[in-house]
C-alpha cells in the first residue's frame, strides 16, 4: 500500500472529517481510518464476473450494496455491548464502510477469448468497474434517503464512506465454480491442491472447454500441461488454434500468472483503482531470473498509477 496515494484519493467523507489512513489489512484491500478509538471493519462480498452476462443488465450490484449495508447493521446490533468490539463498532456506526468486489476476472477474459495483456482487457476493466461504481453509489444514496447519513457522511448524500474493495477470494472462487481468484490470473492451468478433505487435481474449466471443442481434451495433453508447471505454451496441438471475436491464439489467452507481463497487472490495477474507493488485493509473480531493477520498475509504476 502506498499511503500517500491512499490519503490523496480518500473519499470526500474522509477528507471533510480530516480522517487519515495509516495502515491496511493483511490482504491490502481495506483502507480505512484507524486511531486509538477506531479500528476498521471488513464487510465484504464479491460479484462473480464469470457470470457477468447473466447479471450485467440487472440490479444485482444495487441489491448487493443494500445486502452489505444490512450485514453492517446486523454486525452493529450483534456486537453492541461485547467486550473488545468497542472500536470496531464506533467505526461501523460513524462510517458504515462496505467492500463490494469481484472474483473470476481471468475466467471472464478467457471465456471470451481475451488475453490478459492488451487493450481489450483494459477496456473490459474500465467498462465493468465503472458500472460497479455507478450502481453501488446509486444504492448508497437511496439508503441514505431512507435511513439517513451516518456521522462521517453528513452532507455527502451517502449512507457509506466506502463501497468497493477487492479481496483475494481464493476460497470463494472455488465455491463459485472453480473460477479464477479475485482480479488475478490463474497461477497454472492445472495444479494439485491439498486440503483437509484430501488431494485434488484442479483444471482450468475454460481451458478444458477449449480442448474439448478442438477434440484434444485428453489425459496426455493434461499430463503435458502438468509437467510444464501448468503452462500450455509447449502443447503443439494448440499451435494454430484461435478463439474469440478477434481470433486470438489460445496460447495467448491461457498464459499463466508468471507468463504475463507484470506491468499489465499494474496498469489494469491503475485503471481499476479509478473506480474503487478502498483498494485491491493484488499479488505480483516474478520469475527467479527477474532482476532487482525490473522488480523496482514494476513497483514504481504501481506508485505512479495511484
Predicted regions: what they are:
Residues 27-33, 72-80, 164-306:
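Catalytic alpha/beta core of large soluble enzyme barrels
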Amino acid at each position: 500500500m502506498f499511503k500517500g496515494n491512499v490519503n490523496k484519493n480518500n473519499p470526500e467523507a474522509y477528507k471533510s472529517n480530516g480522517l487519515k489512513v495509516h495502515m491496511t489489512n493483511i490482504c491490502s484491500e481495506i483502507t480505512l481510518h484507524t486511531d486509538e478509538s477506531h479500528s476498521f471493519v471488513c464487510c465484504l462480498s464479491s460479484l462473480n464476473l464469470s457470470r457477468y452476462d447473466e447479471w450485467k443488465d440487472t440490479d444485482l450490484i444495487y441489491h448487493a450494496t443494500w445486502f452489505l449495508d444490512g450485514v453492517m447493521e446486523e454486525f452493529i446490533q450483534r456486537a453492541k455491548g461485547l467486550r473488545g468490539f468497542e472500536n470496531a463498532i464506533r467505526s461501523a456506526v460513524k462510517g458504515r464502510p462496505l467492500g463490494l468486489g469481484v472474483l473470476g476476472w481471468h475466467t471472464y477474459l478467457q471465456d471470451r477469448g481475451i488475453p490478459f495483456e492488451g487493450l481489450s482487457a483494459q477496456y473490459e476493466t474500465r467498462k465493468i468497474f465503472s458500472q460497479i461504481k455507478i450502481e453501488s453509489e446509486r444504492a448508497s444514496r437511496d439508503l441514505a434517503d431512507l435511513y439517513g447519513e451516518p456521522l462521517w457522511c453528513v452532507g455527502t448524500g451517502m449512507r457509506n464512506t466506502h463501497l468497493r474493495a477487492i479481496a483475494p477470494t481464493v476460497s470463494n472462487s472455488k465455491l463459485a465454480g472453480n473460477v479464477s481468484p479475485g482480479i488475478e490470473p490463474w497461477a497454472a492451468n492445472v495444479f494439485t491442491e491439498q486440503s483437509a478433505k484430501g488431494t485434488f487435481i484442479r483444471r482450468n474449466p475454460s481451458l478444458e472447454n477449449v480442448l474439448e471443442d478442438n477434440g484434444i481434451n485428453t489425459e496426455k495433453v493434461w499430463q503435458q500441461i502438468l509437467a510444464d508447471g501448468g503452462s500450455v505454451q509447449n502443447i503443439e496441438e494448440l499451435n494454430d488454434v484461435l478463439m474469440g471475436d478477434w481470433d486470438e491464439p489460445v496460447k495467448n489467452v491461457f498464459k499463466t500468472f508468471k507468463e504475463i507481463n507484470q506491468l499489465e497487472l499494474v496498469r489494469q490495477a491503475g485503471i481499476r483503482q479509478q473506480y474503487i474507493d478502498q483498494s485491491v488485493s493484488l499479488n505480483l509473480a516474478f520469475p527467479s531470473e527477474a532482476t532487482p531493477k525490473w522488480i523496482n520498475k514494476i513497483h514504481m509504476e504501481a506508485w505512479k498509477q495511484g
